[in-house]
């Protein structure tokens, strides 16, 4: 059984036991979170597609940790002007483990 959930403007295909890194959620590690925005649920040959979400289906997950992603380096270079600007960014992430798909 798998489901496609929407969180943080992204879509993720999840199964029970899947570990994901998603955009930061303001929840402490060890707590549980429920995703109600489920786009697709599949149980073998039985597939439910939502319009836009599947009703009465939720996905439960446990927060493992909070952290930052890899650093993204931004370099703006102006040729022949002896001008350069460097910048970096690290996205705040939450690591979750899918506990249960309630279909």
From Swiss-Prot:
The protein's superkingdom reads Bacteria
Keywords from the UniProt entry: Ribonucleoprotein, Ribosomal protein, RNA-binding, rRNA-binding
- GO molecular-function annotation terms? rRNA binding; structural constituent of ribosome
GO CC list: cytoplasm; ribonucleoprotein complex; ribosome
- Hey, which family's this protein in? Belongs to the bacterial ribosomal protein bL21 family.
NCBIfam families named among the record's database cross-references: L21
HAMAP family from the entry? Ribosomal_bL21 (MF_01363)
Its recorded name reads Large ribosomal subunit protein bL21
The protein's organism comes out as Vesicomyosocius okutanii subsp. Calyptogena okutanii (strain HA)
């Amino acid at each position: 059984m798998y489901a496609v959930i929407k969180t943080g403007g992204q879509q993720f295909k999840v199964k029970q036991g899947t570990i994901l890194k998603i955009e930061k959620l303001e929840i402490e590690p060890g707590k549980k979170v429920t995703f109600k925005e489920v786009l697709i649920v599949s149980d073998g040959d039985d597939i439910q597609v939502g319009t836009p979400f599947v009703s009465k289906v939720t996905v439960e997950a446990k927060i493992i940790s909070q952290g930052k992603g890899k650093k993204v380096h931004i370099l703006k270079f102006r040729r022949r002007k002896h001008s350069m600007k460097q910048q970096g960014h690290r996205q705040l992430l939450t690591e979750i483990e899918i506990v249960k798909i309630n279909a």
